């Protein structure tokens, strides 16, 4: 399996190779948000390209992480561990954090 760090570097290099944005983080976050919206619409409409739309979201997250120098794989692993230790309570039918 490919490591996320390698994917981050590959995504960033593809941006450089094609002359895509690598400096305007506001733009990158907006584009990632747009891709998430496209994924949501694909899911609502039960379109066959949902997986591709989710891949677009992941690609933007990988690119943003590389631009910012964040090891996304490490952050994900740490967050999964943190979430596994959280205590939740139900409030109005929704689970919310009670304790870290």
Segments from the language model and where they lie:
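Flexible "arm" and connector segments at domain edges
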Residues: 1-100
